[in-house]
């Protein structure tokens, strides 16, 4: 085209040539641009005769192609010869997607453009314009109605699918949430039971100590026990256990922000052992340790539902991983990875450590992510706080508590050092204290190693804050002792020790100073080891002889308080001496239970009144009597005393006490009194002198009540027995005085004439009291034996308040109050009622917020914490109180005002917040209430920033701005009330009374009493319409999918194993065979029974309601339903057995009752005077035990007792007959270890039993032994009253008969008489018995009851009808805990082979299936259990795996290729054989194989039984007297170390092999048993000889050198290293004199040393 423009400028000499050239050039360009869309329409375009251009262009929208093109046009251009000076003909053809109007418009545009372009080539410009036009009009064609309908239907379907998917996902989330919630509930329940059990164990140990050591010089027991203290110990201990919980754990670390969202829950997997895996749900972040670079998370181990802690190190690479790394950087990265691998190797040894004073490690895992390496460690979950947190909150630790901590720290540290583990970073942050006060050491060894890896320069250093302490870092075990000394010094001083060299304060006790010197001395050689420190006098102080003999009453107080609550948690425990306690009203009248909260003002303590047994909250405030703050406090306490309303926390009493405590040198306290430089051991004072106010320094303390305490409430209720306190100074006269004086008691204060000063003395009286006190102090100081210690006088104001047990409104809001609208409005109305009452009394709360609104145990509101409340009095223009007003109350009105600026920023009203000089009235509380109502109505806000933002939006001056998700129809009323309350103009804000009367509030709910009355009447008329309506509504309730899923989630855990089901079937079949040998038949009774309170008086059954409202119960046992069945069917002779489920109710709601499988065997006979049924029943259980080797190993004993003998003993001990049933319950709980001895004594005390009766009772019930040995004790009862003698004679006769019959039947178990055996005495009469063994669980020996039963003749008549006649049969029954037999068989060392069938028939193809079916039918007919494989397409490996999983020994392979033969494969003893058998001979062949297999198993079982019998007698004891030296049996320790895991029977076989081989050699050794050890290994004789080259007597380095040399010469280095480590442990740690190394492979041994 450029050429064309050039040609136009040429002269007229050659016009024809220039036109043709320009036309040709343009055509060439167009063909190149449009390609196949270009078409030359001239017939002879290449001919010699030149014709003007005529072309056709197919055009589309510009830049589009394919499915996006909806329009198209063909542009046809015919040029004249003189083109481009003459306009060409333009035509549009074959248009698509354009209307006629659009085509005409386009054509007119083209014609205009052609005229403008005349003289220039224009076809390309025309084509470009067409493309632009098409782009503008490129629209899809309009759809038909049908197409639109289909599209709409598709969209609706897609929307429905999306909604269904969202609903399904929501249900899944709810189910997962419910599962997590249930797991937490189950875990908390387990935790509660475990803590209660631990509490009982601790109390048992304390009881033993009391019996051994708590004696005064006169030989009497401690006063706390004499005064009925034991029940309180137990009850309050439980309350402590409940109230600790996980909240303390969460306070252990600083709150972690930014690490993980609270809702995140990752799943992590940890390898444990060779193949096992732990699946752990990672919970929220609970803290971080910058020093060690770790983050701590709560986690849940899914297999057991146990809570664990997850320690996580995230090692962030400085540079992204990739090919750009240098070789030096790659070397550093490889080095770090090897270091982490080394840490994992070290961790494998740490997992084995277990000690009460260290936190256990469970598993470790490291994983590489995109830009980091993440290391996770699972550790034991401890419910407690770290000593660092304790240090920051509570200050110095009292010395007696510090001594306890030190002993436990040393025990844990010594255990680590004995196992060659160095802690490396021992500090207050790495020591935890759980809810029971037990110290646990964590972060040992591995944490320091991982922290050091974090320091590598290939990692970012932002996550770790390395120590900048001036203290030197000391390594090794002595370094741990150094850090222990620093830790203890920090605890004693209340702050971290940072100075070097360490200076030990001289005011510490001398023994503690010496202890610290032994820890922090600079020379490592002089520093003591933990073993030496455990023997230090600070840990084991010498008992001091008292100067004055102390009475039991005096000695009991301190112990009593300390037993209830750790003294380090109560501010008073460290400072109040015993003498001060004796004259303190607080300690005389109250018993401290729990610290509820602390703040700048002092502390709030939960106490129990010793007289009425009720719990109260006591606020203890240190005060300065000479300060202005003290006068303000007096006025506020006076105001609070006037409040008495059901929605206001009640203030009962208030008084002041003066105490003296040791002064801290150099730092006098705020209320320090210079005159009080007397001894802390003040002499006795009269109770009336407790209030002594003296002159104090002019400087007043900081404002005490400037902020309110955030209360930590407790939901538990003390179940302690209440006893009147004796030996105290309080009397009934003082109690009467308290009642007369009203709320504020004056029993400890002189009378006051001032109306305003209800409690306090005037100045003259104060000074007089002080002078008297000084005189007394001077007089007492002359009699001091030791030099006086500097003390300071402290005055405390005690305010006794109502204790709210449940929670605060903040807790309720966070738990989702917004979901329960009715409860929300009820609580809001109660808050309004309380506020209206306060305002009516002329007061303003001024600090109203959710944490200051409490809920009691009945879920009623209690407004409390009036620390900022003030009297609503009129102020004059100068801001001073009107003197004429006095103490009178002026009613509030809109013009009333007060001055001040206090409160919490988010809740305070604008008039208070705006200016310090602003005046306000009672409506400031209504503004706060508006914020509170919004929080009650809105979902809990997750983060603090969200809460601040939302609440600040509500406080907008124009109008409240609600969140978007609050703008719906459900919150219309709430929005109206909130908007009214949050009006920034106080005049437009309602009063509490106006709002109560407003129609915006829903009507008040029906009073509970009225509701109860209606329900009572409804339930009383079971035929009425109201009753039917109520039942109908009850049974119309809908269960959500989450509830449906979690109802039985603990039963259906998804871990079904076919082997377990087969074991259960095998056990049941074995037991049934025993029963059938005695002629018993299976008989199952009806499942449900009507509720019967008398039968299950003590045991709680699972109750349900049928559609008519009748209460029925699932069977608690199988005995009662059978007795009912026998009575209703007049059965006189029957032997029956039954294996059925029994049920226990769950304490958690919406859970399936707990199912237990029980086996019952009963004999019913019309013979009344025979003991043979009882003996046969016992013998039957003996036979069951003999059927299972796993039960034979447990050495069961048979305990017998007689209900008449038990009754005779109780009557002989002076227990009235009307209290026997209660005593039976107590004794039953004691036998089943539900109660400790102390709790038993407490319950007996409640029955008003004398101490003599208890002593005599214990004398009898603790007796157990052979009948022959106990006969004299039993005969001593015959000399008593006639009734008792007859009971004893009858019971003794029965016992003698049963014992004799058992001997005749050949029962070889030990038969003992247990006079304390109590088993369902209400159901039985006659002989009762138990089969009991003792097993070790968790380092404790616990009784395990396999079976229990007895004679129950008197139970049957209780179920007979009123018209029933005829004799009553005799019945004896026994119940077997069959689940314990299942567990015993499953856990056997030698696994039991259980197969569902004898032979598996497999078809090799579809064609052979009919032959396989016929063959299976023949096997079934012959009585052979066979199974046919349905899926014939499985491979050989899959078939073999199926047989292994189902423990199938024989397989018959049917194939057409084999003709009339069948391949029989057998998988026996890890070897596979194959044989071709004729199809007709298959049945006989299989039966022969099965007979051979049964014979082999019988022989093996007999051999195992003999082996078990030998083992029971002792591994190294025999009848011939071998191994006996000087009359003492030598029983050396045998350890079997195998490269593979051995079963128990195999291990026992090796032990007996050692016994036989070495018995002569051992008999000739003159050594004690503890000096000999045998190590049995799986090594050849040549390797045993190589061990003689090891250097045993050299040091550790030389020994390791010889070990390396040995390993370099031999294979199996890992196994050899394990053997060498065990030998070294025996030599060095155990210090054994003689060691035999025995090869059970070659039956060869050598003595190594």
UniProtKB/Swiss-Prot annotation:
Location of Phosphothreonine modifications: 667, 870, 899, 904
Keywords noted in UniProt: Acetylation, Activator, ATP-binding, Cell cycle, Coiled coil, Cytoplasm, Differentiation, Growth arrest, Kinase, Neurogenesis, Nucleotide-binding, Phosphoprotein, RNA-binding, Serine/threonine-protein kinase, Stress response, Transferase, Translation regulation, tRNA-binding
UniProt feature, compositional bias: Basic residues: 239-249
Compositional bias (Acidic residues): 731-740, 754-764
Residues bearing PTM N6-acetyllysine: 1259
Gene Ontology cellular component list: cytoplasm; cytosol; nucleus
EC number(s) per entry: 2.7.11.1
Annotated region described as Histidyl-tRNA synthetase-like, given as residue ranges: 1022-1493
Matches recorded under CDD domains: PK_eIF2AK_GCN2_rpt1, RWD_GCN2, STKc_EIF2AK4_GCN2_rpt2
GO molecular function, one term: protein serine kinase activity
Keyword Kinase listed: yes
UniProt-listed InterPro entries: aa-tRNA-synth_II/BPL/LPL, Anticodon-bd_dom_sf, CC_SR_Kinase, Gcn2, HisRS-like_core, HisRS-related_dom, Kinase-like_dom_sf, Prot_kinase_dom
Residues that bear Phosphoserine: 230
Domain comment in the entry: The histidyl-tRNA synthetase-like region and protein kinase domains are necessary for eIF-2-alpha kinase activity and eIF-2-alpha-mediated translational control. The histidyl-tRNA synthetase-like domain is necessary for binding to uncharged tRNAs. Kinase domain 1 is a degenerate kinase domain.
Protein name as annotated: eIF-2-alpha kinase GCN2
Biological classification of the source: Eukaryota, Metazoa, Chordata, Craniata, Vertebrata
């Amino acid at each position: 085209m450029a050429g064309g423009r050039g040609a136009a400028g040429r002269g007229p000499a050659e016009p024809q040539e220039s036109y043709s050239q320009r036309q040709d050039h343009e055509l060439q360009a167009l063909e190149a641009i449009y390609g196949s869309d270009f078409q030359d329409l001239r017939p002879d375009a290449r001919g010699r005769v030149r014709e003007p251009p005529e072309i056709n262009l197919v055009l589309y929208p510009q830049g589009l192609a394919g499915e996006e093109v909806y329009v198209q046009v063909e542009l046809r251009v015919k040029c004249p010869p003189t083109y481009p000076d003459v306009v060409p003909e333009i035509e549009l053809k074959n248009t698509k997607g354009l209307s006629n109007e659009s085509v005409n418009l386009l054509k007119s545009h083209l014609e205009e453009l052609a005229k403008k372009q005349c003289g220039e080539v224009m076809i390309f410009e025309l084509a470009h314009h067409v493309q632009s036009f098409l782009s503008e009009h490129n629209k899809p064609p309009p759809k038909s109605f049908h197409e639109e309908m289909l599209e709409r239907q598709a969209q609706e379907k897609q929307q429905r699918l999306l909604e269904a998917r969202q609903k399904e996902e929501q249900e899944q989330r709810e189910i997962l949430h419910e599962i997590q919630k249930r797991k937490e509930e189950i875990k908390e329940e387990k935790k509660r039971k475990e803590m209660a059990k631990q509490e009982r164990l601790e109390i048992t140990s304390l009881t033993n100590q009391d019996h051994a050591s708590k004696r005064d010089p006169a030989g009497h027991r401690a006063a706390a026990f004499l005064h009925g203290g034991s029940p309180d110990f137990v009850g309050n201990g439980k309350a402590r256990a409940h109230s600790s919980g996980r909240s303390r754990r969460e306070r252990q670390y600083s709150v972690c922000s930014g690490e993980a969202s609270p809702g995140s829950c990752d799943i992590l997997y940890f390898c444990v052992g060779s193949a096992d895996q732990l699946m752990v749900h990672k919970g929220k972040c609970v803290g971080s340790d910058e020093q060690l670079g770790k983050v701590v998370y709560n986690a849940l181990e899914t297999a057991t539902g146990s809570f664990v802690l997850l320690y996580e190190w995230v090692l962030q690479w400085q540079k992204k991983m990739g090919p750009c790394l240098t070789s030096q950087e790659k070397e550093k990265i490889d080095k770090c990875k090897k270091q982490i691998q080394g840490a994992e190797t070290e961790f494998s040894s740490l997992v084995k450590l277990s000690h009460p004073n260290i936190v256990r490690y469970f598993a470790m895992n490291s994983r590489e992510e995109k830009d980091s390496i993440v290391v996770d460690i699972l550790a034991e979950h401890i419910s407690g706080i770290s000593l660092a947190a304790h240090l920051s909150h509570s200050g110095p630790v009292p010395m007696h508590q510090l001594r306890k901590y030190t002993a436990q720290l040393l025990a844990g540290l010594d255990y680590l050092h004995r196992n060659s583990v160095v802690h490396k970073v021992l500090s207050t942050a790495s020591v935890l204290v759980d809810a029971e006060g037990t110290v646990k050491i964590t972060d040992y060894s591995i944490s320091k190693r991982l922290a050091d890896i974090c320091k590598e320069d290939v990692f970012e250093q932002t996550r770790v804050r390395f120590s900048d302490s001036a203290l030197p870092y000391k390594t090794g075990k002595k370094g741990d002792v150094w850090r222990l000394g620093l830790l203890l010094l920090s605890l004693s001083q209340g702050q971290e020790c940072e100075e070097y060299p360490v200076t030990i304060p001289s005011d510490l006790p001398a023994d503690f100073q010496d202890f610290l010197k032994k820890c922090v001395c600079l020379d490592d050689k002089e520093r003591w080891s933990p073993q030496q420190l455990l023997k230090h006098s600070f840990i084991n102080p010498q008992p001091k002889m008292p100067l004055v003999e102390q009475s039991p009453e005096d000695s009991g107080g301190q112990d009593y308080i300390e037993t209830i609550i750790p003294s380090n948690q109560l501010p008073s425990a460290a400072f109040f001496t015993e003498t001060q306690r004796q004259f303190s009203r607080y300690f005389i009248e109250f018993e401290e239970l729990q610290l509820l909260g602390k703040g700048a003002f002092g502390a709030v303590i939960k106490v129990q009144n010793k007289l009425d047994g009720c719990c109260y909250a006591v606020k203890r405030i240190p005060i300065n009597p000479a300060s202005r703050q003290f006068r303000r406090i007096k006025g506020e306490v006076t105001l609070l005393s006037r409040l008495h309303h059901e929605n206001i926390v009640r203030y009962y009493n208030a008084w002041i006490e003066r105490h003296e405590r040791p002064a801290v040198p150099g730092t006098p306290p705020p209320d320090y009194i210079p005159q009080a430089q007397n001894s802390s051991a003040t002499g006795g004072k009269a109770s009336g002198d407790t209030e002594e106010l003296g002159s104090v320094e002019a400087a007043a303390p900081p404002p005490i009540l400037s902020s309110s305490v955030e209360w930590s409430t407790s939901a538990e209720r003390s179940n302690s027995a209440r006893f009147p306190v004796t030996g105290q100074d309080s009397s009934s006269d003082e109690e009467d005085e308290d009642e007369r004086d009203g709320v504020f008691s004056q029993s400890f204060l002189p009378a006051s004439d001032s109306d305003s000063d209800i409690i306090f003395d005037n100045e003259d009286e104060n000074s007089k009291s002080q002078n008297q006190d000084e005189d007394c102090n001077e007089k007492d100081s002359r009699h001091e034996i030791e030099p006086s210690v500097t003390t300071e006088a402290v005055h405390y104001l005690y305010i006794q308040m109502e204790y709210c047990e449940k929670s605060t409104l903040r807790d309720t809001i966070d738990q989702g109050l917004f979901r329960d609208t009715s409860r929300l409005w009820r609580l809001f109305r109660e808050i309004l009622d309380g506020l209206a009452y306060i305002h009516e009394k002329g007061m303003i709360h001024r600090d109203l917020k959710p944490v200051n609104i409490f809920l009691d145990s009945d879920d009623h509101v209690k407004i409390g914490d009036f620390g900022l409340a003030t009297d609503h009095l009129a102020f004059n223009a100068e801001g001073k109180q009107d003197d004429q007003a006095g103490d009178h109350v002026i009613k509030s009105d809109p013009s009333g005002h007060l001055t001040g600026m206090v409160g919490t920023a988010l809740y305070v009203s604008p008039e208070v917040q705006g200016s310090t000089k602003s005046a306000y009235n009672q409506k400031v509380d209504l503004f706060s209430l508006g914020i509170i109502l919004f929080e009650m109505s809105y979902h809990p806000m997750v983060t603090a920033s969200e809460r601040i933002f939302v609440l600040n939006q509500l406080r907008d001056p124009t109008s409240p701005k609600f969140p978007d998700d609050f703008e719906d129809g459900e919150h219309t009323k709430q929005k109206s009330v909130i908007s009214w309350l949050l009006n920034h103009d106080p005049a437009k804000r309602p009063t509490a009374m106006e709002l109560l009367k407003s129609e915006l509030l829903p009507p008040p709910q029906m009073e509970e009493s009225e509701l109860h009355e209606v329900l009572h009447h409804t339930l009383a008329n079971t035929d009425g319409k109201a009753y039917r309506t109520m039942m109908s509504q009850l049974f119309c309730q809908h269960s959500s999918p989450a509830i449906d899923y979690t109802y039985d989630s603990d039963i259906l855990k998804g871990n079904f194993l076919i082997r377990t089901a087969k074991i259960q079937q095998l056990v049941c079949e074995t037991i049934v065979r025993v029963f059938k040998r005695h002629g018993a038949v299976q008989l199952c009774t009806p499942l449900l029974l009507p509720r019967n309170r008398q039968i299950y008086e003590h045991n709680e059954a699972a109750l349900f309601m049928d559609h008519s409202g009748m209460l029925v119960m699932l069977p608690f046992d199988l005995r009662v339903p059978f007795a009912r069945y026998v009575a209703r069917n007049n059965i006189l002779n029957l032997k029956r057995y039954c294996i059925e489920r029994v049920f226990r109710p769950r304490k958690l709601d919406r859970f399936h009752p707990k199912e237990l499988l029980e086996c019952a065997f009963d004999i019913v006979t019309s013979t009344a005077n025979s003991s043979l049924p009882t003996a046969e029943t016992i013998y039957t259980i003996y036979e069951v035990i003999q059927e299972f080797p796993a039960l034979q190993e447990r050495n069961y004993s048979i305990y017998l007792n007689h209900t008449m003998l038990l009754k005779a003993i109780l009557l002989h001990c002076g227990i009235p007959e009307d209290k026997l049933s209660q005593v039976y319950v107590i004794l039953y709980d004691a036998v089943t270890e539900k109660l400790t001895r102390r709790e038993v004594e407490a319950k007996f005390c409640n029955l008003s039993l004398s101490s003599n009766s208890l002593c005599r009772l214990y004398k009898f019930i603790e007796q157990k032994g052979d009948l022959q040995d106990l006969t004299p004790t039993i005969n001593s009862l015959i000399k008593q009253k006639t009734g008792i003698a007859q009971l004893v004679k009858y019971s003794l006769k029965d016992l003698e008969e049963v014992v004799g019959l058992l001997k005749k039947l050949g029962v070889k178990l030990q038969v003992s008489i247990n006079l304390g055996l109590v088993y369902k005495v209400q159901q039985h009469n006659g002989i009762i018995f138990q089969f009991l063994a003792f097993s070790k669980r968790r380092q404790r020996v616990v009784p395990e009851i396999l079976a229990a039963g007895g004679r129950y003749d008197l139970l049957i008549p209780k179920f007979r009808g009123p018209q029933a006649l005829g004799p009553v049969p005799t019945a004896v029954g026994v119940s077997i805990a069959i689940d314990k037999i299942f567990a015993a068989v499953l856990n056997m060392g030698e696994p039991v082979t259980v197969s569902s069938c004898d032979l598996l028939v497999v078809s090799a193809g579809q064609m052979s299936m009919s032959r396989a079916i016929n063959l299976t039918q023949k096997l079934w007919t012959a009585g052979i259990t066979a199974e046919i494989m349905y899926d014939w397409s499985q491979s050989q490996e899959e078939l073999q795996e199926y047989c292994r999983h189902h423990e199938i020994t024989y397989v018959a392979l049917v194939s057409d290729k084999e003709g009339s033969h069948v391949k029989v494969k057998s998988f026996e003893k890890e070897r596979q054989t194959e044989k071709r058998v004729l199809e007709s001979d298959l049945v006989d062949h299989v039966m022969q194989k099965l007979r051979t297999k049964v014979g082999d198993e019988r022989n093996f079982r007999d051999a195992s039984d003999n082996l078990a019998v030998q083992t029971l007698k002792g591994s190294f004891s025999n009848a011939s007297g071998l191994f006996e030296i000087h009359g003492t049996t030598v029983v050396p320790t045998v350890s079997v170390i195998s490269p593979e895991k051995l079963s128990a029977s195999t291990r026992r076989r090796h032990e007996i092999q050692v016994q036989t081989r070495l018995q002569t050699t051992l008999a000739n050794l003159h050594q004690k048993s503890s000096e000999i050890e045998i190590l049995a290994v799986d090594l050849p004789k040549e390797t045993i000889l190589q061990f003689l080259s090891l250097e045993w007597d050299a040091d550790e380095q030389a020994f390791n050198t010889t070990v390396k040399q040995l390993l370099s010469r031999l294979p199996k280095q890992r196994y050899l290293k394990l053997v060498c480590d065990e030998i070294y442990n025996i030599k060095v740690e155990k210090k054994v004199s003689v060691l035999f190394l025995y090869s059970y492979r070659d039956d060869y041994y050598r003595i190594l040393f």
